[in-house]
């Protein structure tokens, strides 16, 4: 059995850790509320962008824009969104596991794909396993602005536009609820027919100048940038929710450990007192 001093030291250190995890839980909860608000505020913009895409691309059956035209896939592109920090449970690990599983199932060697990474966790994981990273960005704000991730989005889009890849897939953790997030993948390039016809098409009766192809060349890259940014906002909400849950579980576990250690301390203290009383009684009896 551990000594009273050792048990007391463990109780004190666990209490300090509990204070830290409780504070981190509260911080993550606050960040989650802001992330949910950011995602909600971004939705109307995406709806309007989809309306514009529907009006321009959906109204024209013979559009030939590269972002709307599937081509033979010889090289795939993967944009994976992970966190910069730890203490978020299996948030990054689940996304990376899904990515690696799909890459190993689809490709024979690294010449068949390119990887773009957001987040230090993803960079470290892939480098340690020998994967080549085409482009990476770390130290992304907890509440990212569009400007803060625009370079990443542009690089991924340029890979497709310059035909270095023939498709772009994004891997991330989709925020379902505070208690649930789902490792998800989706193809963002080429844009599917569904993507170009999701809007309500309120602009379809307009005449476009100079022509629809010229307009598509401007708004389609902006639309894909928006898809990527919206996905990053979704992933950030998932990250904050996962970290909040992880810190709550850590706090609960610390509370349980403190209770167990306190019980062990009291038992050890009682045993020590009992032994001291026994020794005193035994000494008194010997003197008689």
Curated annotation (Swiss-Prot):
Biological process according to GO: proton motive force-driven plasma membrane ATP synthesis
Topology within the bilayer: Peripheral membrane protein
GO MF, any single term: ATP binding
CDD domains: F1-ATPase_gamma (cd12151)
NCBIfam families assigned to the protein according to its UniProt record, in alphabetical order: ATPsyn_F1gamma
HAMAP family, sorted: ATP_synth_gamma_bact
Keyword Flavoprotein included in the entry's annotation: no
Primary location class: membrane
Assembly: F-type ATPases have 2 components, CF(1) - the catalytic core - and CF(0) - the membrane proton channel. CF(1) has five subunits: alpha(3), beta(3), gamma(1), delta(1), epsilon(1). CF(0) has three main subunits: a, b and c.
Function per UniProt: Produces ATP from ADP in the presence of a proton gradient across the membrane. The gamma chain is believed to be important in regulating ATPase activity and the flow of protons through the CF(0) complex.
Tree of life domain: Bacteria
Localization of this protein: Cell membrane
Protein's name according to its UniProt entry: ATP synthase gamma chain
Protein species of origin: Staphylococcus aureus (strain JH9)
Record key words, sorted: ATP synthesis, Cell membrane, CF(1), Hydrogen ion transport, Ion transport, Membrane, Transport
UniProt similarity note: Belongs to the ATPase gamma chain family.
A cellular-component GO term for this protein: proton-transporting ATP synthase complex
């Amino acid at each position: 059995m551990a000594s009273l001093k050792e048990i007391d030291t463990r109780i004190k250190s666990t209490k300090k850790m509990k204070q830290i995890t409780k504070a981190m839980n509260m911080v993550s909860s606050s960040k989650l509320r802001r992330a949910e608000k950011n995602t909600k505020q971004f939705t109307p913009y995406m709806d309007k962008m989809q309306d514009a895409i529907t009006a321009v691309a959906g109204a024209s059956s013979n559009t030939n824009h590269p972002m709307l035209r599937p081509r033979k896939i010889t090289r795939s592109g993967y944009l994976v969104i992970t966190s910069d920090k730890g203490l978020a449970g299996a948030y990054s690990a689940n996304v990376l596991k899904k990515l690696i599983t799909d890459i190993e199932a689809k490709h024979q060697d690294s010449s068949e794909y390119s990887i773009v990474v957001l987040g230090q966790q993803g960079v470290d994981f892939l480098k340690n396993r020998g994967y080549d990273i085409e482009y990476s960005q770390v130290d992304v704000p907890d509440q990212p602005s569009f400007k803060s991730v625009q370079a990443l989005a542009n690089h991924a889009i340029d890979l497709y536009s310059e035909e270095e890849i023939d498709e772009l897939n994004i891997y991330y953790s989709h925020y379902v609820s505070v208690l649930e997030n789902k490792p998800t993948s989706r193809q963002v390039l080429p844009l599917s027919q569904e993507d170009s016809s999701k809007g309500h098409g309120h602009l379809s009766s307009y005449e476009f100048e100079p022509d629809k192809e010229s307009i598509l060349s401007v708004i389609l890259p902006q639309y894909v940038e928006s898809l990527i940014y919206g996905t990053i906002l979704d992933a950030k909400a998932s990250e904050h929710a996962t970290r909040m849950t992880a810190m709550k579980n850590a706090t609960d576990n610390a509370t349980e450990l403190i209770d167990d250690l306190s019980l062990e301390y009291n038992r050890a203290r009682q045993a020590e007192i009992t032994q001291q009383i026994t020794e005193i009684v035994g000494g008194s009896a010997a003197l008689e």
